[in-house]
Each structure stands twice: as structure tokens, then as C-alpha cells.
């Protein structure tokens, strides 16, 4: 089963408008466009364990290659080869399709094609590069003008919190504890051979989420003072005024972990709630280990970024793109055709969209029909 994208013209216009708006924001922040390959080396994806092997779409003609399941790995590989000598930090943006394989009906495999846009910030020697990335994400979504009565929630965590949890309570059963915490599975947690006091603490942590400083206070009671929590507190104190300015609610969820095994450090999702439906419109995080994997000699192996779901945003923007001025050029007598051709060239030189009807037209009703059929906003008669 394949979820093939076949867009109508309105959806195509919406996609183009969303991507154009996002690209304009990225450029203002000093980012440059890259176009990573759609085809990946399957061993690279498997070697980093970025995604489960059964979710990868391999090529029939060459089982060593696959369609990219995400953008970041391709871009990090690119900067370790083609862009290895370019000065850091690298600020890169990209648009394109990714391809997923998911479980379908009766164990069938469902192939999905998705449109993404995003940025990557590589080699920025600063303690909190997340501030720039998060600021750009908020700015990007703000420029898109979402529908009224939508609520935005910025869900944040760090893989370091899970490390704290497992270090204190994990004993020799870290993997199953981690799985139950991520899945919010109390039943599985109950089956683990673990001290009852530890189980009680883990259940408390499992459902600890909300306003960042309140959550950090609770975490401090569990783990004591820690640099990890101090750094988180500083990050939230910095981005809170920014999120308030954009009307975005921030929540810290210690057990949140992304599906892709890319990230180590800060991870996040931007969720939009509209009419009781939730849409993940962006996700991202920090992936220093991925940078080190592809280039062990990287001086500042710092990498982070985000991807935005164009497919979900298309459902949430206020309206389609505003209709641009589009002129239909008509003439009544064939002797005026040359003049009409020259007029079209003049309009094009002014960056005005114009369509020339090559057949003479003498009937105003037909003229109106031609205007509507061509999607034009006005008629210019050549006399």
C-alpha cells in the first residue's frame, strides 16, 4: 500500500507559499540552501541506527540504497565531504520529500511520502545554540499566519534527564525501564523486578510534565542539584519571553523521546491544536554524536536543527495564498495580435502574470468565461 502524494492545484499553491515564506525567514537569519540526495546508503542509516530497518524503503534495483527516511543524516554526511572546508558555523536550510514505511492493515506495509522544510546549525561554538534554532522556529511559524483559535505547545525535553533517571533507578534493567517511561506504560513498569520505592518514584516522574520551572523544581527533589537542570533552567528563562511574544506555551516533559534515534541532548516538538485535533508541525533537537560520527576531526562537533511538516501546516494556515494579479490579454481583430504579443512582453518585464488568448474575441460573455477558465483577475483589451 502506497500513500502517493497527488495534490490538487490549491494544495500545490499552498505548499509553494508555505515553503516560500519559510525560505524567506531562513535567509533573513543568514542560512544557505542545500539539496541533499534523495538516495541514501542504507548501511549509513543502519550503522547509526537512526531508524528501524523495517521502516526503510530500499530500492528494488539496488538493496544497498534507500529513499531517505529523514533529511539530517544526508546533510551531515554532506558537510563532512563536500562542505568539509567551509568555515564554521554552517547555517543550512533545505526543502524536500522524505519516505517512510509503516505497518498497515493486516501486517501490510504502508509507504508514505512527506514534504519537509528545515534548518541545520553546525559547528557553532556556544553553550546554548538551541536559543537560535528555537527563535527561528517560532519566527517561521509566526510568519505563516495559522488559523484562528489554534493553540501552540512547544514540548521540550533532554535525553540527559532520562540518563539521570536511569542512573538513579535503572539498576541493570535500564532498557525496559526506559521503554516503559517513554510509552507511559505503568503495567509494564509493574512487571519489573524493582524496589517498590523506585517504582513509585518512576510513576511520579512518568506523569511529571508542564511549566518548565515547576518541573525542574520537582526533578531537583528527585536528583538534587545538577548542571543538567541548571542549564535547562537557563535555557527556559531565556526562551520564555520569546515564546510569550509569539503566544506559544512551553512544556517540559522529562520522558519525551523522539522516534528517530538521532538526538542526544535537547529534543523538542511544536504541536498545534485546532478543533481538538493535534498536529505535530515541527520536531528537532541536538545531534552532536551524528556530527562526530561522520567527521571525527570536526573542531566543534555541535549539531542541531529542526524539520517542519508542510503536510500538516497546509491544513492549518488561514487561507490559501492570496490571488496574485493575473491579466488576460484579449483583442478583437487579428491585426492586433502583434500589438498584443508586445503588450504581454511589457507586462512580463514588470513581473506581472499575463496570459495572451491567441484567438480573437469579440464577445464580452466569452471574454468573461475565458478569464474565469484561465484563473485571471482582470482583462486587458488591446485596441
Can you annotate each of these PLM segments?
Residues 55-61, 169-194, 272-274:
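Acidic, His- and aromatic-enriched active-site or binding-groove loops in soluble protein domains
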Residues 36-54, 153-164, 256-265, 363-369:
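Beta-rich nucleic-acid/ligand-interaction surfaces
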Amino acid at each position: 500500500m502506497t500513500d502517493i502524494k497527488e495534490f490538487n492545484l490549491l494544495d500545490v499553491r499552498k505548499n509553494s507559499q508555505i515553503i516560500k515564506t519559510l525560505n524567506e525567514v531562513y535567509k533573513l537569519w543568514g542560512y544557505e540552501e542545500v539539496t541533499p540526495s534523495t538516495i541514501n546508503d542504507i548501511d549509513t542509516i543502519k550503522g547509526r541506527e537512526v531508524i528501524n530497518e523495517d521502516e526503510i524503503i530500499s530500492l528494488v534495483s539496488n538493496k544497498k540504497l534507500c529513499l531517505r527516511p529523514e533529511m539530517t543524516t544526508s546533510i551531515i554526511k554532506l558537510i563532512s565531504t563536500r562542505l568539509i572546508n567551509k568555515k564554521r558555523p554552517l547555517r543550512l536550510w533545505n526543502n524536500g520529500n522524505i519516505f517512510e514505511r509503516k505497518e498497515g492493515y493486516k501486517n501490510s506495509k504502508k509507504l508514505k511520502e512527506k514534504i519537509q522544510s528545515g534548518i541545520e546549525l553546525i559547528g557553532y561554538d556556544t553553550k546554548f545554540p538551541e536559543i537560535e534554532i528555537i527563535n527561528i522556529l517560532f519566527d517561521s511559524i509566526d510568519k505563516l499566519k495559522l488559523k484562528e483559535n489554534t493553540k501552540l505547545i512547544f514540548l521540550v525535553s533532554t535525553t540527559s534527564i532520562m540518563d539521570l533517571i536511569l542512573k538513579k533507578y535503572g539498576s541493570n534493567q535500564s532498557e525496559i525501564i526506559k521503554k516503559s517511561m517513554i510509552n507511559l506504560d505503568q503495567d509494564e513498569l509493574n512487571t519489573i523486578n524493582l524496589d517498590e520505592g523506585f517504582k513509585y518514584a518512576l510513576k511520579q516522574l512518568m506523569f511529571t510534565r508542564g511549566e518548565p520551572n515547576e518541573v525542574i523544581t520537582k526533578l531537583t527533589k528527585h536528583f538534587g542539584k545538577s548542571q543538567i537542570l541548571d542549564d535547562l533552567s537557563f535555557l527556559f528563562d531565556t526562551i520564555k519571553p520569546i515564546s510569550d511574544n509569539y503566544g506559544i506555551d512551553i512544556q517540559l516533559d522529562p520522558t519525551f523521546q523522539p522516534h528517530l534515534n538521532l538526538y542526544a541532548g535537547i529534543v523538542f516538538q511544536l504541536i498545534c491544536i485546532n478543533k481538538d485535533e493535534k498536529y505535530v508541525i515541527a520536531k528537532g533537537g541536538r545531534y552532536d554524536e551524528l556530527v562526530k560520527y561522520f567527521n571525527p576531526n570536526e573542531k566543534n562537533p555541535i549539531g542541531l536543527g529542526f524539520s517542519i511538516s508542510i503536510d500538516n501546516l497546509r491544513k492549518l494556515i488561514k487561507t490559501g495564498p492570496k490571488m496574485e494579479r493575473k491579466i488576460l490579454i484579449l483583442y478583437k481583430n487579428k491585426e492586433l495580435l502583434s500589438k498584443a504579443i508586445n503588450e504581454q512582453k511589457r507586462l512580463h518585464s514588470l513581473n506581472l502574470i499575463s496570459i495572451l488568448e491567441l484567438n480573437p474575441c469579440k464577445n464580452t460573455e466569452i471574454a468573461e468565461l475565458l478569464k474565469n477558465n484561465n484563473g485571471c483577475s482582470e482583462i486587458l483589451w488591446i485596441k
